[in-house]
Amino acid sequence: MKVGIIGAMEQEVTLLRDRIENRQTFQRAGCEIYTGQINGVEVALLKSGIGKVSAALGTTLLLEHSKPDVVINTGSAGGLASTLNVGDIVISDEVRYHDADVTAFGYEPGQMAGCPAAFPADEKFIALAQDAIDDLQLNAVRGLVVSGDAFINGAEPLARIRTTFPKAIAVEMEATAIAHVCHQFGTPFVVVRAISDVADKASHLSFDEFLSVAAQQSTRMVEAILAKLAAR
């Protein structure tokens, strides 16, 4: 099995990249893909860039170039669930756009025309991620992750998301675009991210301070998942 791993920022991929054995690099259209092995598992690690367009472009290149069997989206996220703190883990059971609105034509909030209302994550890899959580004894929440081209920093956008998507546990800027492309290709995916900030009026300060913590925690999670795959 080959596992595709996607992070948006340098800080979100650097620890995993350093762990890749027999590493080779592929660059195109501002994206970087690193292939090799981690824990004996074939991986293709993509640094996509920030936002939905960059994520969709990079995911398409990853799926065409490396043809992974599954995609794990890793990195940082803003926490929405009350039980989440910096360094805790979120696992997607589904993802939605929070900034798409074609409700005038009968679609659900966050649903893009011609697309599912939500993109469900792969149940087998959700279970694998949960097993890794149990082994590492980390605090984690499983649920809806929402994505949009905005860093949520302030009461008004936060209230809008919580009102429109009351079940959302985390917010970030790439996961749904990644899932959308995976859906088009028929490739299973799961989002496993660590909390860098709790979405509120000071979230930009928390993000700057705790991004490295989130990167370390999400890297631990991905490595634990890969170790479980290697043991099968």
From Swiss-Prot:
It catalyses: S-adenosyl-L-homocysteine + H2O = S-(5-deoxy-D-ribos-5-yl)-L-homocysteine + adenine; S-methyl-5'-thioadenosine + H2O = 5-(methylsulfanyl)-D-ribose + adenine; 5'-deoxyadenosine + H2O = 5-deoxy-D-ribose + adenine. Keywords: Amino-acid biosynthesis, Hydrolase, Methionine biosynthesis. GO terms for cellular component: cytosol. Pfam families: PNP_UDP_1. Pathway: Amino-acid biosynthesis; L-methionine biosynthesis via salvage pathway; S-methyl-5-thio-alpha-D-ribose 1-phosphate from S-methyl-5'-thioadenosine (hydrolase route): step 1/2. Signal peptide: none annotated. GO terms for molecular function: adenosylhomocysteine nucleosidase activity; methylthioadenosine nucleosidase activity. InterPro entries: MTA_SAH_Nsdase (IPR010049), Nucleoside_phosphorylase_d (IPR000845), Nucleoside_phosphorylase_sf (IPR035994). Its EC number is 3.2.2.9. The active site is at E12 (proton acceptor), D197 (proton donor). Substrate binds at G78, I152, M173, E174. GO terms for biological process: L-methionine salvage from methylthioadenosine; L-methionine salvage from S-adenosylmethionine; purine deoxyribonucleoside catabolic process. Homodimer. Belongs to the PNP/UDP phosphorylase family. MtnN subfamily. Catalyzes the irreversible cleavage of the glycosidic bond in both 5'-methylthioadenosine (MTA) and S-adenosylhomocysteine (SAH/AdoHcy) to adenine and the corresponding thioribose, 5'-methylthioribose and S-ribosylhomocysteine, respectively. Also cleaves 5'-deoxyadenosine, a toxic by-product of radical S-adenosylmethionine (SAM) enzymes, into 5-deoxyribose and adenine. Thus, is required for in vivo function of the radical SAM enzymes biotin synthase and lipoic acid synthase, that are inhibited by 5'-deoxyadenosine accumulation. This is 5'-methylthioadenosine/S-adenosylhomocysteine nucleosidase. It comes from Pectobacterium atrosepticum (strain SCRI 1043 / ATCC BAA-672). The gene is mtnN.
